Amino acid sequence: MIRHAFFAGLLGLATASSAWAADMIEKTSPHSVAETIDRLEAAVEAAGATVFARVDHAAGAANVDMELRPTQMLMFGNPKLGTPAMLDGQTAGLDLPLRVLAYENGEGTVHVTYHDPASFAAAHGLPGDAKYIQMMTGALDKLTTAATAAE
């Protein structure tokens, strides 16, 4: 009995992990991680949004004598979009401001990854067809496309 419950639990975790991964949108970048995040930051600021934080995970790892391939996260947002989401479901603050991760994989390819706003809308009981979700989705696509453009 316990054995069946254990395997059912593992299956549930695997399914949840797969669903969470399916809700991530990923693009590749021809630029380094640092340049990709620089370009993203410039695009965010040009769009009139606010950059709240830039986290260099590899630098953090180096501070504790560990090595991590280049990995940086940019946290940004616009209260005109985030506030209505939080008014509909205050727990949306766990996923806001928006975050985009750029990292270099073992083969040297730079990836840009972010969560699809529709997935966190569902997680926080927000209406999936809300205008702010559509606007966040469009903004993330536009901003990450600018950051990963070959130009």
Regions found by a protein language model. Give the residues of each.
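Stable alpha-helical elements in mature extracytoplasmic
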Residues: 36, 40, 57, 132, ...
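Beta-strand/loop substructures that line and gate deep hydrophobic ligand-binding cavities in soluble
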Residues: 99-126
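N-terminal secretory signal peptides that target proteins for export/translocation
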Residues: 1-2
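C-terminal partner/receptor-binding element of secreted or periplasmic proteins
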Residues: 118-151
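Compact, glycine-rich, soluble single-domain proteins
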Residues: 45, 49-52, 56-98, 102
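Soluble non-cytosolic domains of exported or imported proteins
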Residues: 30-35, 52, 127-134
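Terminal, regulation- and interaction-focused segments at domain boundaries
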Residues: 19-48, 145-149
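Bacterial N-terminal signal peptides
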Residues: 5-16
